[in-house]
């Protein structure tokens, strides 16, 4: 329970850091925040390594380092996304963001594998390597990356203390909250997030309890028997493989269609996949449902970030990307409710409720794009006057 509380506390700090990171990326520049974040992560990893070394074993210092690393990761993220939006033409952003999405997913697959092999017996050297790589990254960013942020215009006034500066930041984010298009984008993202967050929550519980040991395929008298834990690993690996191989291809395909249609259809496919999970306990059925699920994920993998950069004013991209990441944070906070719900209502009803949330997100996307298109038409009309 203490570990859970500490993780929640760390997550709360990360939310604040993410919002501040977006603000500072706009104010001080993308490059500066990326360099500082990488260097801070590197130093934190080195201290983490020392706290997990043969000479010192301190869980308290390890947790502090873990929290600091999470904080600066949250600061790095909006700055890096805003930099991509600064340098890439609007028509190419979906493809570029898709490449980043692919590389991130490959890292998510490789990272736990390396951790599984080295963390237990070679923890010090693993953390030391992570620290040195982050410091190397900060040097590379400092020397070879150019600043891309537009000049920051701060209102003229008296010099602010840190409390006044914090108040100014909150007021800046109030402007974003008043952007109804963006607000609906976050709301729809939180609802659709209840589907893909179940990969780590409801789905493994469902597979463990409902999927019996069965033959995946057989040749003559020989057959490959798969247990429930192996079945979950198999469909999770399928998702990772599909994402790693087909993200760029699917993103290019989706760029031929209107963003509105892509978002809406993706939500409906998510709903279909979730319902299919609840209707089968066969491994092949689960694999087909996961294929649909993965396709729904890939449909919006690149265009989500591209859409954020489209609706965000050029001088506020850092803040918009930071605020947009809250849809994942809120999703993580709400999604675990599916576990007690499965005990109260059963798996079938729980999956159905999640599917309904996905359908509601499709409706919100429809309203959002209708409003966004009207807003664009009004702006064009004003320019023509």
Q: How would you label these PLM feature ranges?
A:
Residues 16-53:
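Conserved MFS/SLC helix-loop-helix module at the cytosolic interface between two early adjacent transmembrane helices
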Residues 148-186, 382-385:
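Juxtamembrane intracellular "pre-TM" segments in multi-pass secondary transporters
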Residues 138-157, 367-381:
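Helix-loop junctions on the cytosolic side of multi-pass membrane transporters
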Residues 44, 57-75, 285-299:
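Hydrophobic core of transmembrane alpha-helices in multi-pass small-molecule transporters
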């Amino acid at each position: 329970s203490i570990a859970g509380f500490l993780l929640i506390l760390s997550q709360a700090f990360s939310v604040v850091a993410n919002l501040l990171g977006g603000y500072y990326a706009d104010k001080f520049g993308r490059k500066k925040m990326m360099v500082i974040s990488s260097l801070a992560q590197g130093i934190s990893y080195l201290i983490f390594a020392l706290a997990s070394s043969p000479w010192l074993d301190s869980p308290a210092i390890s947790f502090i380092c873990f929290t600091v690393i999470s904080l600066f990761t949250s600061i790095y993220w909006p700055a890096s996304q805003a930099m991509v939006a600064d340098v890439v033409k609007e028509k190419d952003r979906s493809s570029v963001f898709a490449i980043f999405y692919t590389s991130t997913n490959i890292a998510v697959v490789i990272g736990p594998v390396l951790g599984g092999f080295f963390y237990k017996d070679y923890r010090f050297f693993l953390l030391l390597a992570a620290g040195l790589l982050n410091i190397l990254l900060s040097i590379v960013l400092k020397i070879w990356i150019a600043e891309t942020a537009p000049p920051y215009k701060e209102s003229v006034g008296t010099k602010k203390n840190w409390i006044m500066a914090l108040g100014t930041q909150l007021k800046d984010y109030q402007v974003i909250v008043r952007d109804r298009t963006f607000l609906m984008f976050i709301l729809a993202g939180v609802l659709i997030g209840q589907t893909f967050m179940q990969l780590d929550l409801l789905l493994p519980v469902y597979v463990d309890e409902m999927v019996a040991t069965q033959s995946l395929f057989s040749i003559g008298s020989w057959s490959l028997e798969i247990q429930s834990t192996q079945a979950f690993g198999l469909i999770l690996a399928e998702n990772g493989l599909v994402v790693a191989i087909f993200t760029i291809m699917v993103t290019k395909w989706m760029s031929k269609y209107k963003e509105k249609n892509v978002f809406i259809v993706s939500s409906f496919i998510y709903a279909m996949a979730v319902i299919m999970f609840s209707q089968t306990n066969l491994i092949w059925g689960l694999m087909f449902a996961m294929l649909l699920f993965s396709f729904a994920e890939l449909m919006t993998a690149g265009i989500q970030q591209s859409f954020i950069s489209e609706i965000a004013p050029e001088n506020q991209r850092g803040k918009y990307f930071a605020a947009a990441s809250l849809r994942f944070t809120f999703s993580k906070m709400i999604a675990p409710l599916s576990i007690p719900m499965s005990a109260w209502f059963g798996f079938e009803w729980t999956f159905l409720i999640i599917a309904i949330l996905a359908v509601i997100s499709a409706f919100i996307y429809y309203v959002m794009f209708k409003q966004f298109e009207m807003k664009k038409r009004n702006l064009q009309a004003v320019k023509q006057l």
